Curated annotation (Swiss-Prot):
This is 2-succinyl-5-enolpyruvyl-6-hydroxy-3-cyclohexene-1-carboxylate synthase. Homodimer. It comes from the Bacteria. It comes from Cytophaga hutchinsonii (strain ATCC 33406 / DSM 1761 / CIP 103989 / NBRC 15051 / NCIMB 9469 / D465). Keywords: Magnesium, Manganese, Menaquinone biosynthesis, Metal-binding, Thiamine pyrophosphate, Transferase. It catalyses: isochorismate + 2-oxoglutarate + H(+) = 5-enolpyruvoyl-6-hydroxy-2-succinyl-cyclohex-3-ene-1-carboxylate + CO2. Its EC number is 2.2.1.9. The lineage of its organism: Bacteria, Pseudomonadati, Bacteroidota, Cytophagia, Cytophagales. Binds 1 thiamine pyrophosphate per subunit. The keyword Transmembrane does not apply.
Length: 559
């Protein structure tokens, strides 16, 4: 077992310090070895699905791999939603799964399934270790594969890796276990993506042929140096809420409302001849349709990605460098381009006060206005997590006023599962305030996020409880069907009050605007416990208000 007992030290030497394990018998050698390593921080989370998302949140904060440890059988499958999200969101995770000896697979033995390559192509790499841990060659193999797994997880694009480890009985150590102190550690320097001077000259020559260039940012971590550089570029940048470009001078964050509201003649003036995209997944359906429907638009992607999705169906150039380098090496300047920037900014200048005026005058208590108020109360340097469905879309429509806020969302796969656990894990790794805005289905789906012994007092949960999946009332298809309530909206009558009591969280319920404003005065203040702010609304009224908002913005162009 010496090779197994040395795995924690190898990972520590690579800078890995965080471990989330779920209790089990077959994984005992791993659990004991990691828990007895004095320099690792161990969190024990019983629910494997929640554990994996908590690990995802921790890695989002640290930008280092978090280790996941589980027993054999279905436990490993429960990691799958978070592994897929980590793969597409490019978050490093290292899964260590215990397994039965290979000869016992498919022999009707308990907790025994086919675990090899269980995550398929959603894991960056899979490594199968031997069950014969005492052999010298096996020790060498273990050291080599663990080192390789860490390097692959951290190589761009970052992502999850899986190491499957079979154990024979007996696997519980008797007495102390011995750490060798000097296991083999293999470091790998990450390559730099660079282009030659001739390539940059060619890129600049092509760039000069375009007169109206529009940058589009997908999901991207907050990067102050990039934000400063973007602010000095003479081009409009469309920044979604998850692009973390809010507050930058030439960034357009009202594109969703803008593209569905302005007259067609004005829309034509906003059409670029080149779109340069960067970052991950895009949220806006209308932005995608706007670019896809204009066949004359060319599309470049900037980023050192292995694969580049042709999201606009116009991709013609891939530049495999980070955007910072691209902006440093190229120049975008022309009178036409300056006019193009101003057209976009003028349209946004019209939209922003209209959004503010609508929400300050709205008398019906609803989710959209509630999110507007919550976002306006966010403290400086807020860490904001957004659940999928309407929460992230409301925020994308409204924009973030706090320039230094960092925004996160599980947009890798855009599922509702694990959003509370992700924010929970992030909160465990920072002393700063972490806020999650979530709908009721995502909240109750992931209620086991709170089922552990770690209670971050810096966690703030804003629960938009309309007692169902409100997004389905916003969509033309399901909203017109008689099965809307039962098959799509999934009406429920739950409240977070008892969950808050059970897990020691401060709880406030708001059913009107005055109650919300009063609650927000103290909600973000420091406290000994985490807090839940439950905002109860009616889904029918929410839909009516949001549709009225869109109509109001459209009419503002006619007045």
């Amino acid at each position: 077992m010496q090779a197994i007992y040395d795995i924690p030290e190898i990972l520590f030497q690579h800078g890995v310090t965080d471990v989330v394990l779920s209790p089990g018998s077959r994984c005992a050698p791993l659990s004991i070895a990691f828990s007895r390593h004095k320099k690792l921080q161990i969190k024990v989370v019983p629910d494997e699905r929640s554990a994996a998302f908590i690990a995802l949140g921790m890695s989002l904060q640290t930008q280092k791999p978090t280790v996941l440890i589980c027993t054999s059988g279905s436990a490993l499958y429960n990691y799958a939603p978070a592994i897929v999200e980590a793969y597409y969101q490019r978050v490093p995770l290292i899964v260590l799964s215990a397994d039965r000896p290979p000869e016992w697979i498919d022999q009707n033995d308990g907790q025994t399934i086919r675990q090899q390559e269980i995550y398929g192509k959603h894991s960056k790499a899979f490594f199968q270790l031997s069950a014969e841990h005492e052999l010298p060659d096996t020790q060498w193999e273990t050291y080599r594969k663990v080192n390789e797994a860490v390097s692959i997880s951290e190589a761009y694009p970052k992502g999850p890796v899986h190491i499957n480890i079979p154990f024979r009985e007996p696997f519980y150590p008797k007495g102390e276990i011995m750490f060798s102190g000097s296991p083999t550690v293999i470091k790998r320097e990450q390559p730099l993506h660079t282009l030659s001077d001739e390539q940059w000259k060619s890129i600049q020559h092509k760039l000069d042929s375009y007169k109206k260039i529009l940058f589009v940012g997908g999901q991207h971590l907050y990067d102050e140096s990039l934000r400063l550089k973007i602010g000095n570029i003479k081009a409009p940048f469309i920044g979604e809420v998850v692009s973390n470009l809010h507050g930058v001078r030439n960034v357009i964050h009202t594109h969703d409302t803008l593209l569905t509201s302005i007259p067609l003649t004005d829309l034509e003036e906003l059409k670029p001849d080149l779109v340069i995209s960067f970052g991950g997944a895009l949220l806006s359906k209308w932005l995608k349709q706007f670019i896809r429907s204009n066949e004359s638009i060319d599309h470049w992607y900037v980023g050192p990605d292995v694969t580049t999705p042709d999201v606009f169906q116009h991709l013609c150039q891939i530049i495999p460098v980070q955007l910072n380098e691209f902006l440093s090496k190229t120049t975008i300047a022309s009178n036409t381009q300056e006019q193009f920037v101003q057209r976009w900014i003028q349209q946004q200048t019209h939209i922003i006060p209209a959004i503010r005026e609508f929400n300050t005058k709205e008398k019906v208590f609803n989710e959209f206005t509630a999110v507007f108020d919550v976002l306006n109360h966010l403290p400086a340097f807020a860490k904001l997590h957004l659940a999928n469905s309407m929460s992230v879309r409301y925020a994308n429509t409204l924009g973030i006023s706090q320039r230094n806020a960092e925004v996160f969302a599980n947009r890798g796969t855009s599922g509702i599962d694990g959003v509370i656990s992700t924010a929970y894990g992030y909160a465990l790794k920072t002393s700063q305030l972490v806020t999650i805005i979530t709908g009721d289905l995502a909240f109750f789906y992931d209620r086991n996020a709170f089922w552990n012994n770690y209670k971050p007092s810096n966690l703030r949960v804003v629960l938009l409880n309309n007692h169902g999946g409100g997004i389905f009332r916003m969509i033309d298809g399901p909203s017109a069907l008689p099965e809307l309530d039962e098959l799509f909206e999934t009406k429920q009558t739950l409240s977070a009050r008892y969950l808050a009591t059970e897990h020691g969280l401060e709880y406030t319920l708001c059913k009107n605007l005055n109650g919300l404003n009063q609650a927000l005065e103290s909600f973000f203040q420091p406290s000994m416990f985490g807090k839940i702010l439950e905002i109860e609304t009616d889904s029918v009224k929410n839909t009516e208000v949001f549709k009225r908002f869109k109509k109001t913005i459209q009419q503002s162009y006619l007045s």
